[in-house]
Amino acid sequence: RFQSEYGLQSFPSMATIRSFTAPAALSPASPVMRAHQKFDGGHGNQSLLFYIRKYYGEPKDFDSFVYLSQVMQAEGIELAADHLRSARPQSMGSLYWQLNDVWPGASWSSIDYFGRWKTLQFHARRFYAPLRVAPIRRDGRTEVFLVSDRTAPLDARLRLRVMDMDGRLLHERLDQVHVPALASTRVAELADAALLQGADPHRSFAVFELIVQGRAVSRHLLYFDRASTLQL
């Protein structure tokens, strides 16, 4: 299988939006913003708001709406890409839609019309890297996959740290791992209780790092609930 087209929309940067919109029209429901939204007959902005409210809470202003649309897009596509890469060999490819734009507006791109990178483009550099640590959490358990597109196997270390929102280390472990070539390898399955060890899931997060020759070549932050519930 090769997943060749999947995506989530977001808005371009505020600098790009201001190139086609007057200050008085900076609203998801304004005629100009709807005209620059080609999904669902101009109603796609309401879909963006639905997911933003569900996962991040109510945006405090238009700038926050634009910013959160990019965060939502980046985290959603990253989740899909990690699932697809970790499912190798059942899934042998992952291409999100789309790279760039032919005009400025809300779209599925990771680079906007003027060449400005959205948040997704920065995330894609990490989740499409040749070596990737991909923790996949569902139903209170996390499976940890090591994904390699390299043609030679290697030995590495997998570091796991659990920290609180103030940056304090709660506990950590360091394991030797073998990373086969051209493969996805499941190296651990961890229950939330084992990761948290009594810590508050809304005040804690896990950091997974794949370390090769003393350097972290892949890093992934795992949260235990949606962002709107976290106590930052």
Question: Language-model segments: what does each one mean?
Answer:
Residues 1-154:
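Substrate-binding clefts and catalytic carboxylate motifs of secreted carbohydrate-active enzymes
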Residues 90, 152-156, 171, 202-204, ...:
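Short loop/turn segments at connectors of secondary-structure elements within structured domains
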Residues 106-107, 173-175, 220:
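Short hydrophobic alpha-helix segments
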Residues 142-148, 189, 206-210, 232:
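Buried hydrophobic-core signal for structured, non-transmembrane domains
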Residues 147-149, 161-165, 209-213:
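A generic structural motif
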Residues 157-201:
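Intrinsically disordered, low-complexity Pro/Gly/Ser/Thr-rich segments with frequent PxxP/GP/PP motifs
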Residues 197-215:
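Short, aromatic- and glycine-rich surface loops/edge beta-strands on solvent-exposed regions
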Residues 215-232:
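Short beta-strand elements
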